[in-house]
Amino acid sequence: FCSGYSSSPSNTNSPQDGPRFPSVTYYDNINAQDKLISEHFGITNPLMYLGFSMGAQQAFHWGALHGEKTGGIIPLCGTAKTTTQNWITLEGCKLALQSDFNYNNGDYSSPPKKGLKAFSRNYTSTLFDKEGYEEGLHLNLFDGFEDTESYLNFMDSFFGSIDANDLLGMLNTWQMGDIGKHEKFNNTKEALANINCPALVMPSSTDLSFPARNNIPEVKGMPNAELKVINTKYGHLAGGMSTTL
């Protein structure tokens, strides 16, 4: 949800349009996915759930709730619970977007371009660590960039193409991420213990958003999980947007 394709602030009619769109959790997303593949496609025992970043967090949630009927999960560069540090980083990115006068508390008549650019510059700073950016690895992404400014302009264009309320909706889902926040479980530890399907957890060794160290206690709390750290200089993007490790 909130991607702009499925139900989102940008395509939902009043009274739940724009900033009035309800908060969506990862469990809301995976339950809708389960309904789609089981009722529409007739898939009741999926072989694998693989996801990167927010998709990795969804993979953990899927495993906690639907692991018994799934062959396995592979979370790439994500955690079962959003850390406080990660939450604060996202809060800063949200505020950067919302500080645009044209944002108008979400009731904008045209895209808040300055706010979207401010978000882009803030968030993009987290994609590589210091060494990755200093070595110019960001210039190797996609078809390559001449310099850092052209890289930033590309990212600005990418994030600028997303509706601001949709983007904020996805960030809200990310911030609320915690597999323990479900009526079936009392806490995160209990939810981790319920991921009975095989799990291959693959963090990036240089990820600033989801450091590999945060997956260590999560994997220890899962009955059938293995941790394989991707040894890379490509930060968060090693899990899904970089063709080079």
Each language-model region and where it sits:
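Alpha/beta-hydrolase-fold enzymes
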Residues: 69-157
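Active-site nucleophile elbow and catalytic-triad environment of alpha/beta-hydrolase enzymes
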Residues: 151-154, 169-191
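Conserved alpha/beta-hydrolase "acid-adjacent" motif
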Residues: 184, 208-214
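Short, conserved loop/helix-junction motifs that constitute active-site signature segments
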Residues: 192-196, 220-223
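Short beta-strand/loop motif that positions the catalytic acidic residue
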Residues: 195, 201-203
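Short glycine-rich catalytic loops that host catalytic nucleophiles or stabilize transition states
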Residues: 205, 228-234
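Catalytic histidine-centered segment of alpha/beta-hydrolase-like enzymes
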Residues: 233-244
